[in-house]
């Protein structure tokens, strides 16, 4: 089989190509009154966030990793007039609540922009002051204090969530919160229209039109045989079952099992990758709270049912034993954030201490601020490459959240 542009058969294989999104003007459109609606707790300082992100990208390049940017790929995907028009229509359709019937005027505003300017503006959002429109609807008088026709997308620098590379394909995700739902439109157009991906037979295991929510932070590729997916506030059991059926029926798939792991519906446990992240053949960084529950969890292993067009589901309760079994290792080592200390662990978990990016077996990228966790990783034989993130972390995501692997070497 000809090698395609997507290949991710593990969490730990040597990373060759990664998708990032450089923080942009969308962060400057965060204001205190509307933080929660855009899923932020704080406002990063854009200049410093960009400097930190640039250093993150350079750190990856220094390790021989190709870095590609979502905003650039998106602009390169809409060069054809018809594609650009459809892209704008999809964005505006998803934004009807805020554009208040002003599609025509907004399209006129967009018509003056280059492809790259258009993508950047859609990501940044449109303030009402940017387009002088006559108030004609009652809802506009009532909603006059809301500052945007097009909401900013400040979460976009977390490229892990709107899509997920699995095997030679991707899921293009229906995001749980409306604030993030438009984000997966970009990858939809990239796969269909970018020269790097179009006509390359990249399977879409789930697309954004699915009625069921799923987010990439809940999707972990444990091996060429096994996926682990969190059942969380943002990822539904229905989406996981649909994904399993779609992957299992693919004639070229190598995946045989999906381990669905229920996690609490709280912001602390936002996604599975805030609870555990694979960093070596038998090692995981974990949220220390998992130790209280690890032998009493709802874990479901989904398998194809002996060649039939159906699945079978086996329930278990012990996380460590389940992971060791599906990874075919004697045991797995859980390395707790902040060494499990009641203070250090809570602080470093808030700062995404367990959200590490593995770039090859036993080598991870982490925030330098999580020094207790980083030293513990080193004590366990893990090579730790530290990056600064005083502003990036304000979005509540770590190096794994900020990256979407497109190609890893097989292990």
Swiss-Prot record:
HAMAP family with a match to the protein in the record: Arg_deiminase
One GO-annotated biological process of the protein: arginine catabolic process to ornithine
EC number: 3.5.3.6
Catalytic activities: L-arginine + H2O = L-citrulline + NH4(+)
Keywords: Arginine metabolism, Cytoplasm, Hydrolase
Protein name as annotated: Arginine deiminase 1
Superkingdom of the source species: Bacteria
Family from the record: Belongs to the arginine deiminase family.
InterPro entries according to UniProt: Arg_deiminase
GO MF, one example: arginine deiminase activity
Active-site residues annotated for this sequence: 401
Subcellular location: Cytoplasm
Lineage of producing organism: Bacteria, Bacillati, Bacillota, Bacilli, Bacillales
GO CC field: cytoplasm
Pathway terms, separated by semicolons: Amino-acid degradation; L-arginine degradation via ADI pathway; carbamoyl phosphate from L-arginine: step 1/2
PANTHER family assigned to the protein according to its UniProt record, in alphabetical order: ARGININE DEIMINASE
């Amino acid at each position: 089989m000809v090698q395609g542009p997507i290949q991710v058969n593990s969490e730990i294989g040597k990373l060759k190509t990664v998708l990032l999104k450089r923080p942009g003007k969308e962060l400057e459109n965060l204001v205190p009154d509307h933080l929660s609606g855009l899923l932020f707790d704080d406002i990063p300082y854009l200049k410093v966030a960009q400097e930190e992100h640039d250093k993150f990208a350079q750190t990856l390049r220094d390790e021989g990793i190709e870095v590609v940017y979502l905003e650039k790929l998106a602009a390169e995907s809409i060069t054809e007039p018809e594609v650009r028009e459809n892209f704008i229509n999809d964005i505006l359709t998803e934004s009807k609540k805020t554009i208040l019937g002003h599609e025509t005027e907004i399209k006129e505003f967009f018509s003056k922009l280059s492809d790259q300017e258009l993508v950047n503006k859609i990501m940044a959002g449109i303030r009402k002051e940017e387009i002088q429109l006559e108030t004609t609807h009652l809802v506009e008088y009532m909603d006059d204090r809301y500052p945007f026709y097009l909401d900013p997308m400040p979460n976009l620098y977390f490229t892990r969530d709107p899509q997920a590379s699995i095997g030679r394909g991707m899921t293009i995700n229906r995001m749980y919160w409306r604030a993030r739902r438009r984000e997966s439109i970009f990858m939809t157009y990239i796969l269909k229209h970018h020269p790097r991906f179009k006509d390359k037979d990249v399977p879409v295991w789930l697309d954004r039109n699915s009625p069921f929510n799923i987010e990439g932070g809940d999707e972990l590729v444990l091996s060429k045989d096994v996926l682990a997916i969190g059942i969380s506030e943002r990822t539904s059991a229905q989406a996981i079952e649909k994904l399993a059926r779609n992957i299992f029926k693919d004639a070229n798939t190598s995946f045989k099992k999906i381990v669905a792991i229920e996690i609490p519906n709280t912001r602390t446990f936002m996604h599975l990758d805030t609870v555990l992240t694979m960093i070596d053949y038998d090692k995981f960084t974990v949220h220390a709270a998992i130790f209280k529950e690890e032998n009493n969890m709802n874990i479901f292993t989904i398998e194809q049912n002996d060649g039939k067009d159906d699945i079978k589901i086996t329930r278990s309760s012990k996380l460590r034993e389940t992971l060791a079994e599906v990874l075919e290792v004697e045991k797995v080592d859980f390395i707790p954030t902040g060494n499990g200390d009641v203070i250090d662990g809570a602080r470093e978990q808030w700062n995404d201490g367990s959200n590490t990016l593995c770039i090859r077996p036993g080598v991870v990228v982490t925030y330098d601020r999580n020094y207790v966790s980083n030293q513990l990783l080193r004590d366990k034989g893990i090579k730790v490459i530290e990056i600064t993130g005083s502003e990036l972390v304000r979005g509540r995501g770590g190096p794994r959240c900020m990256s979407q692997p497109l190609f890893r070497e097989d292990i």
